[in-house]
Curated annotation (Swiss-Prot):
GO terms for cellular component: cytosol. It comes from the Bacteria. This is Aspartate carbamoyltransferase catalytic subunit. It catalyses: carbamoyl phosphate + L-aspartate = N-carbamoyl-L-aspartate + phosphate + H(+). It comes from Pelodictyon phaeoclathratiforme (strain DSM 5477 / BU-1). GO terms for biological process: 'de novo' pyrimidine nucleobase biosynthetic process; 'de novo' UMP biosynthetic process; amino acid metabolic process.
Length: 311
């Protein structure tokens, strides 16, 4: 049983809730990687609405797989084929789905704060699957799970987040969650992509990637939204790649072995080189956890669904 009704972000969430979710996910992961995984149908007869106003591959499919492993049914909502295309508001959409007796909402929306909004108009559980540049809590939880599984603990780890931190909901949730779990967090990006409140977040700030890598135990590389190059934030994608792209040459120069995470999708040869993204074993100065993160995402989202829906 849990006292957690919604998961709209990791800001102010107690460490005990994070630990409980990660511990539960560890149990699910052990079964997931067996040839024929079988789980207790703890969410049998539950109906979960996957309400995605933005495209998604990993998040939407992993929530759907997670729900089915636990015995729940899913309703897949597409904004383009719904009454939203006729002008229906988010509030009316949620109220109508609730009237169909769904038990929970998993929401992805382009507007920051959308998930918090619907917690005020529904009595059902709400899980934020990414809202604008606000938060993406389950991505951060799966990143934290990946780090804990590899290092044994998050406490004391130095984690550098590289890229467009200003617009990144993944960065926000990771900063909040990792600090709560005892990690030291740094961010590395051009000053044009530095959040205005960065110096109030309790993190270390870098604009030089070599220095950031030398400081860190592990790196979370963010997807560069390609429109930033034409929006005045960057001179060009090529220049960004030269100064902030994670490459073997840079790691060798700094002489640093680094565990590398990325939330996906990746822009190959822009924020991360092919060989860094794909290397899962030595030789080399990096170890990629990108596909391991995807596997862990199912386990973590199972834990989140079970935690919230078995109150």
């Amino acid at each position: 049983m849990s006292d957690l009704k919604h998961l709209t972000g990791l800001c102010n969430i107690p460490a005990s809730n994070i630990t409980s979710i990660l511990d539960m996910a560890a149990g699910y992961k052990k079964k997931l990687i067996t040839p024929c995984p079988s789980f207790e149908p703890s969410l049998q007869n539950k109906r979960i609405a996957l309400v995605f106003f933005e495209n998604s591959t990993r998040t939407r499919f992993s929530f759907e797989i997670a729900a089915r492993h636990l015995g729940a049914g899913t309703l897949n909502f597409s904004a383009s084929s719904s009454s939203v295309s006729k002008g229906e508001s988010l509030s009316d959409t949620i109220k109508n789905l609730e009237a169909m007796q769904v038990d929970a909402f998993v929401l992805r929306h382009p507007s920051s704060g959308a998930a918090d909004l619907i917690t005020r108009i529904t009595s059902k559980n709400v899980i934020n699957a990414g809202d604008g540049s606000h938060e993406h809590p389950t991505q951060a939880l799966l990143d934290m799970f990946t780090l804990r599984e590899y290092f044994g603990t998050i406490d004391g780890l130095k984690v550098i987040i590289i890229g467009d931190v200003l617009h990144s909901r993944v960065a926000r949730s990771n900063i909040y969650g990792l600090i709560t779990a005892g990690a030291e967090v740094g961010i590395c990006c051009p000053v044009t992509l530095m959040p205005p409140d960065a110096d109030q977040l309790g993190i270390t700030l870098f604009t030089d990637l070599d220095r950031a890598i030398a400081w860190a135990d592990t790196a979370i590389v963010l997807r560069l939204q390609l429109e930033r190059a034409t929006g005045g934030y960057l001179p060009s994608l090529e220049e960004y790649s030269v100064h902030y792209g994670l490459t073997d040459e840079r790691l060798e120069r700094v002489q640093k072995h680094l565990l590398v995470l990325h939330p996906g999708p990746i822009n190959r040869e822009i924020e991360i080189a092919n060989n860094v993204a794909d290397r899962i074993q030595p030789p080399g100065y990096s170890k990629s956890m990108l596909l391991e993160q995807v596997t862990n995402g199912v386990a973590v989202r199972m834990a989140v669904l079970n935690t919230l829906l078995t109150l």
